[in-house]
Every structure is written in structure tokens, then in C-alpha cells.
Amino acid sequence: MEAELAATIRAGWPAGNESPGTKSAQAFTLIEILVTIACVAVVAAVLLPAAARSRALAKRISCCGNMKRIGLSFRTWAIDHNEHFPMQVSVANGGTMELAASGAVFPHFQVLSNELSTPRVLHCGADTERRCPTNFTSDLTDGRLSYFLNMDSAHGDGPSLLSGDRNITNRATAGSPLVSLTKGTSIGWTKGLHSKQGNLCFADSSVRGCTNGAVGTFLQIHAGVTNHLAVP
């Protein structure tokens, strides 16, 4: 009788010494894992774009800081040079006036090495296509710079555009190394650096961020005045 009962129990017992309900417990655990993975994926889909936007905003804020430093450096230099920026002072007197027509940007920053202190402020963190310059001599070239300069900017002229992100559009002026801007010129930002947004620095060292549609308004270009931008 006992032998028959034992045989009956063994016949109904799962193979591999598994207790009843083990498979269902394992299946439930697998479902839990899949649900957890799905939840993590949803959270990541929500948070990652927000994190990317936060990083982009941080880089743009840092870029504004760079431009503020550039603007203040130009103003400091002008105090020691009869209220003129380097572009209006002869090379013989420590300026870069004779170099302005070449379209090169780096010489104008080189003469500001004392005021800028470090060449790192000439590179935007969002400018991943270019490497940050390490010194003001051998490593400072247009290929290391993130910012353009307006050759016609004047110290004391608040609305005068001084500098800005290099991803400005309409940069190709036929037969000239400089971009010529007058009132009504179509201007904007490319997708690079700040995703069709950008920062502008003015002669009074103020910095303004603007969207693609507002950049023309912020430039404040007056009728009859032409601004020549050297874009690296």
C-alpha cells in the first residue's frame, strides 16, 4: 500500500526535483524583469532628451561667458589705445588695422593675449568640430576659433556688433574674405553649435542670445552702414 502511494506521488511530481508552482514562479519573475526593463526604457526616453537640452543650455551659457570676456578684453585694450579697438590701430602701434582686410580673425585676438589671459575663451564648448587652442602663438589659428569679429566695430558705440558665434549664415561674399552686412541683409544661424540659435557680443561688452528669426533685429544695422565680418 505504501509502495503504491509513493509511486503515485512520484508520478505527479515535476521532473528535476522541482516543487509544484516553481515554473509559474519563474515565469512571473521573468515578466517582472520585462516590465522593469520597459519602465526603464520609458524613463530614459523622457529624461535623456531633457538631459541633452540641459547640456546644450549649459554650453550656451558658457559661450555667453566667453563672449563677455572677449567684449571686456576689447574695451580694456581700447582704454590703453586712445579708445580704439585693434582693428582701428596700426600694426606699428600694436594694433591690427592693416590685417583687417585679409579676413583672418586670430591676429586680432593675439594682440589681446594679456587682456584675455587664456585662449580657451575663444572656443565654444558646443563647437565639437574644432579643438580648443592651447596658446596665443603657434596654436592660435582661425581653425581653432569659434567666434567671428566685426572689423567695423568701434569702442563706445553700444549698438555696434563686435563678435558672435561663427555659425552665422550668409557668410560667403563673392570675391571677398569678409562678410558684408547692411540693413536688410538676410542673416541667421546654421544648425551647428547652438541649433539655429546663437550669441552676439556688442561693443559695450553686452551679450545677447537670439534665435534664428531675431538675429537680424539684434544686429541693429543702420541704413547706409556696412559691417564687415571676419568669420573663422
Predicted features along the sequence, with ranges:
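N-terminal single-pass transmembrane signal-anchor helix
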Residues: 21-55
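N-terminal leader/signal peptides at the extreme start of proteins
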Residues: 1-28
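Short catalytic/ligand-binding loop motif for oxyanion handling, primarily in non-cytosolic enzymes
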Residues: 78-79, 85-88, 94-96, 129-135, ...
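Structural recognition of the beta-strand scaffold that forms the well-ordered cores
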Residues: 86-87, 121-125, 160-163, 199-201, ...
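Conserved hydrophobic/amphipathic alpha-helical signal-anchor segments
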Residues: 45, 49-106, 118, 207
